[in-house]
């Protein structure tokens, strides 16, 4: 009998910059209060980079921790997939910069732009490379410097986002191992592009005095429509992937959702009839770090002892685009 080859997560590493911006700091910057932010988002503070620190820098720090935790050299990595919407520059890709900074001699890689679903999309992509049998070590990273595209006079967005990164190493399962990435469902619905976007800097609106004056290089968000879609879609995607695998919310040992808003996560868990002790919420400390949220939440789950070998783990995300996804995996260590 031949075992099914799956991709398993064998190591994890995360990084957030040391500088913290609290709700009380924001009270001095815009018309808001700590209580208002907490009640509507669940966020108390977020970490921000200093000037000159980019997405590749956070990615490299997370990757170094990941590889050290696995006890391998960077040179063993064969492929790098980076989920980000805040690349250091339009090109070269963040993956190229990470490869160079880590000193990996024979890897290839690329970036995945899927908003807050970026880590999930990257994880699936990396898993498929492992499943193909062509690669044995794929580095998957989610890294975003959201502060680079936030208008800190706009209270609708500046209270939400933070900077951070996380990395996982994917390797093939051994014969007889029933762990790894079990299933996934992803979707894009471009009709949602009008609700969360950054219009400046691309080929449609290249950088100019006009785009700067019109604040087109900042995030624009219709929070109400994004919230409604996220609550509906995250529940829908998680229910689909569970049903396809003959599981229910009670079979899940750990639910790790994109940390966009505490109310979205709670609403999804309630719809799945999942006890809140199985739900990972760390948005209070980090805010929304876009592609960084899920690996950062994985680290929280590990630290809290909620991830053990064989645990059924459900991941879910909704992001700009709209993009959405749910991934079912069985924890490997």
Curated annotation (Swiss-Prot):
Residues annotated as the enzyme's active site: 116, 258, 288
Describe the protein's quaternary organization and the partners it interacts with.
Answer: Homodimer.
> Family per UniProt?
Belongs to the thiolase-like superfamily. FabH family.
Q: What EC numbers are recorded for this enzyme?
A: 2.3.1.180
Q: Which organism is it from?
A: Koribacter versatilis (strain Ellin345)
Q: Tell me where on the tree of life, at the top rank, the source sits.
A: Bacteria
Is Cytoplasm one of the keywords?
yes
Q: Does the keyword Cell inner membrane apply?
A: no
What domain comment accompanies this record? Answer: The last Arg residue of the ACP-binding site is essential for the weak association between ACP/AcpP and FabH.
Chain spans, region ACP-binding: 259-263
User: What is the first-listed, main subcellular location in coarse terms?
Assistant: cytoplasm
What processes does the entry annotate via GO biological process terms? Answer: fatty acid biosynthetic process; secondary metabolite biosynthetic process
InterPro entries found in the cross-reference section: ACP_syn_III_C, ACP_syn_III_N, FabH, Thiolase-like
Pfam families, sorted: ACP_syn_III, ACP_syn_III_C
Protein name according to UniProt? Beta-ketoacyl-[acyl-carrier-protein] synthase III
Question: Per its database record, what is this protein's job?
Answer: Catalyzes the condensation reaction of fatty acid synthesis by the addition to an acyl acceptor of two carbons from malonyl-ACP. Catalyzes the first condensation reaction which initiates fatty acid synthesis and may therefore play a role in governing the total rate of fatty acid production. Possesses both acetoacetyl-ACP synthase and acetyl transacylase activities. Its substrate specificity determines the biosynthesis of branched-chain and/or straight-chain of fatty acids.
Named in its record, the pathway it takes part in is: Lipid metabolism; fatty acid biosynthesis
Alphabetical list of CDD domains matching this protein: KAS_III (cd00830)
GO CC annotation = cytoplasm
- Tell me which stretches of the chain form a coiled coil: none
Q: Where in the cell is it found?
A: Cytoplasm
Q: Name one GO molecular function term.
A: 3-oxoacyl-[acyl-carrier-protein] synthase activity
- Which controlled-vocabulary keywords does the entry list? Acyltransferase, Cytoplasm, Fatty acid biosynthesis, Fatty acid metabolism, Lipid biosynthesis, Lipid metabolism, Multifunctional enzyme, Transferase
Q: Which reaction does it catalyse?
A: malonyl-[ACP] + acetyl-CoA + H(+) = 3-oxobutanoyl-[ACP] + CO2 + CoA
